[in-house]
């Protein structure tokens, strides 16, 4: 069996290593590769996937655009408006979204979100997954630099919204999720450090670096932190359930992946 992750750029992806560890744990004979697909090549790539791959993970910037090329999308894909997992069977392409469970599982490993106030920073695809993951149990507010974009997302998904500069509002939340790329450079923060308090639970959807400045400040202040690698592993195991009907316990894969990166 052959699986792949597609995106652009893709060289930073840890998905091949993650799935290699998982396949070895399950004693599954399969390969997992990364394929750099620039946006203008997506159509060409998708036209031949059914002859090559059993399943595909989709990352930035293709999670929305790829929906043009699938035959069947599940309800969650339609709700989020994006897919990160494709299953190819009998010449048909089926689309799924496991990012939602990636967020939900990561947060629930740290805290029960029921009834808590959640601030989601950002209004892109990652933010959509975070909102859908938590809106049924928690009070979710989308904070974004461009207020109009936050408004559109919030109204579509039935949650509140505010500007990213409204830091006093952000501070009043229990869980703060960074769903922006800010912090990938190892220097930048999506919000000022003084917004973060010890009572907060912080999650960063960025997984490289493993501890972004956002999470480092949280750790220094005694806040609970959830790194993006945990989400990557949980969504990856959910993808394997789609493809193979089973997956190892995510924590076993997570610990092995952490050790291999040390």
Curated annotation (Swiss-Prot):
Cited CDD domains: NAD_bind_Shikimate_DH
Binding locations of shikimate: 13-15, 59, 84, 99, 207
Keywords attached to this entry: Amino-acid biosynthesis, Aromatic amino acid biosynthesis, NADP, Oxidoreductase
One record GO biological process: amino acid biosynthetic process
Pathway recorded for this protein: Metabolic intermediate biosynthesis; chorismate biosynthesis; chorismate from D-erythrose 4-phosphate and phosphoenolpyruvate: step 4/7
Keyword Transmembrane helix: no
Residue numbers binding NADP(+): 75, 122-126, 144-149, 205, 228
Gene3D superfamilies: Leucine Dehydrogenase, chain A, domain 1, NAD(P)-binding Rossmann-like Domain
Transmembrane segments: none
Function recorded in the entry: Involved in the biosynthesis of the chorismate, which leads to the biosynthesis of aromatic amino acids. Catalyzes the reversible NADPH linked reduction of 3-dehydroshikimate (DHSA) to yield shikimate (SA).
Protein name per UniProt: Shikimate dehydrogenase (NADP(+))
Biological source species: Ignicoccus hospitalis (strain KIN4/I / DSM 18386 / JCM 14125)
Organism phylogeny: Archaea, Thermoproteota, Thermoprotei, Desulfurococcales, Desulfurococcaceae
Gene designation per UniProt: aroE
């Amino acid at each position: 069996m052959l699986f792949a992750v597609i995106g652009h750029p893709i060289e930073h992806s840890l998905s091949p290593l993650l799935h290699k560890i998982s396949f070895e744990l399950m004693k599954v004979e399969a390969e997992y590769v990364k394929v750099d697909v620039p946006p203008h090549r997506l159509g060409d790539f998708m036209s031949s996937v059914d002859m090559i791959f059993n399943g595909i993970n989709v990352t930035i910037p293709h999670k929305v655009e790829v929906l043009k090329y699938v035959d069947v999308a599940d309800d969650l894909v339609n709700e989020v408006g994006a897919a990160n997992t494709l299953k190819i069977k009998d010449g048909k392409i089926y689309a799924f979204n496991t990012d939602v469970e990636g967020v939900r599982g990561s947060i629930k490993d740290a805290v029960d979100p029921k009834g808590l106030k959640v601030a989601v920073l950002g209004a892109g695809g990652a933010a959509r997954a975070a909102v859908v993951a938590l809106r049924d149990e928690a009070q979710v507010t989308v904070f974004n630099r461009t207020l109009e974009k936050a408004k559109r997302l919030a109204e579509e998904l039935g949650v509140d919204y505010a500007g990213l500069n409204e830091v006093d509002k952000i501070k009043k939340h229990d869980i703060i999720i960074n769903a922006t790329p800010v912090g990938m450079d190892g220097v930048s923060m999506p919000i000022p450090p003084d917004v973060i308090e010890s009572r907060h639970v912080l999650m960063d959807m960025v997984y490289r670096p493993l501890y972004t400045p956002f999470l480092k400040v949280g750790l220094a202040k005694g806040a609970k932190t959830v790194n993006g690698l945990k989400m990557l592993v949980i969504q990856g195991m959910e993808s394997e359930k789609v493809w193979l009907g089973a997956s190892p316990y995510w924590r076993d894969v997570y610990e092995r992946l952490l050790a291999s990166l040390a």
